[in-house]
Amino acid sequence: MLVIKMLFKYQIKTNKREELVDITPYIISAISESKVKDGIAVIYVPHTTAGITINENADPSVKHDIINFLSHLIPKNWNFTHLEGNSDAHIKSSLVGCSQTIIIKDGKPLLGTWQGIFFAEFDGPRRREFYVKIIGDK
């Protein structure tokens, strides 16, 4: 058995202060390039005002609802003690999380029919990066 470990770095430009950007094609590309058939992919964002999440990718209103609910739950102008203007983004990032792990089966991400992998931007627009670590066998 040959264990493969590869790290991929991607950069994206977000367009709004808060949005969910579909990064599923990047993950599929990393898995394909790694040639791993069975294993895991860890998707990680090294930012304190962004996150990674998995959710429905068929109906765009789901992305809208997630952003709206988080904004309702954590309003931008709440009474924060961290006063740099992006305090809400730090809390949203903590709730969403900075990584996701997915299973690779038969050379593809094991996702549900409607699932996609999203970069969650909470303090954009700006240039961002995320990493994909692939571990598995050919």
From Swiss-Prot:
Q: Which cysteines are joined by disulfide bonds?
A: none
- Read off the Pfam families from this record: UPF0047
* Record InterPro entries: UPF0047_YjbQ-like, YjbQ-like_sf
> What is the protein name for this chain?
UPF0047 protein MJ1081
Q: Which family does it belong to?
A: Belongs to the UPF0047 family.
